[in-house]
Amino acid sequence: MNPTHYICKYTPTELLTALGGTCVLLDEAPENFDLSDQVAHPNLCGFGKSILQAVLSGGIRELVLVNCCDTIRSAYDILKEYGNLDFLYMLDLLHNQGGCSVDHAKGQLIALAEAYGTYKGTRFDRAAFLAAFQPERPLTGPHITVLGARMGADLFQMTQQLLPLPTENSTCVNNRSVGAPDPAAEDFDALMEQYARALLGQIPCMRMTDKSGRKQLYNDPGLAGVVYHTVKFCDYYGFEYAQLKEELSVPLLKLESDGTRQSQEQLRTRLEAFAEGFQRQEAPNTGPAAQGYYAGIDSGSTTTDVVILDQDKNIKAKVILPTGAGASGGAARALDQALAAAGLSQQ
């Protein structure tokens, strides 16, 4: 049996499961876009191209999309003509979380259930639907969170391996959290209305009109640092990064990829520099009053940022210097100046 691939947190995976489907997140970054470039405009963003590349490579037979943005709508149109899929469907969801948006989403869910059930030759299994909801298990204690646009399984795995603290993937589809409807709902129509409300009531993605709920992703007492990922030519998440750069008191690293695996070694270097900033700076051992410090380093192509925090997450010093000819040398100079400003040393 072929799995049904999906890309978006608003995909009703529990409904598809209740109709006999096996849902798999399409989250792999290709090596290149040699196939997608043959059928898509060169300016299509890397995420859209990665979807096309995966389908055209022949490993996907069933795909459910959500109209997240113009790129996904374009990808859907291209796949209708060139994808040769057994099942291709796109949900049309509005950008609000209540009112008419819930009614519209309910209609979309009912239409999808009819189309998918006809394709599979199955009927809705209420018990399987309710059993498909899984409670979220967020990290507790000090941790680093990856925010922004999806970064792909390979890049996230590398991020986990390089960073010194437990790392949580809260990008895009990976912060999905859908509450289970009331099992006492009398009929399928009422159940789908509750389900639509739960889907739209998740922590919003950047396509939604009201994005204030996204603060839950970083207003966390255990948050020790943030890696913020964006995709080249995608504007949605750049605005949030600009806001967080001003608001966050924890170390922040921005990464940008093009949707392929080709830039991963360059990103590895930046992640390694960021990880070094979490090495605990030991103060002289004076007994119970001894205090630890943390330094975060973000070495970019033009500037290098260093921030030093105490164990209570208070900023002790912050320095921004031109990176210069060598990233490692620029990071060392910036760290030395930040330590001097904080009255500390690396010993």
Tell where the protein language model's regions lie, with residue ranges:
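An N-terminal assembly and electron-transfer interface module characteristic of large anaerobic redox
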Residues: 1-294, 312, 324
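A broad structural signal for short, well-ordered beta-strand segments within beta-sheet-rich domains
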Residues: 167, 315, 346-347
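Short, intrinsically disordered/low-complexity patches at protein termini
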Residues: 277-278, 329, 339-342
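Short glycine-rich, Thr/Ser-proximal phosphate-binding strand/loop in the N-terminal lobe
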Residues: 297-337
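Phosphate/pyrophosphate-binding loops at sites that engage ATP/ADP/AMP, CoA/4′-phosphopantetheine
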Residues: 335-347
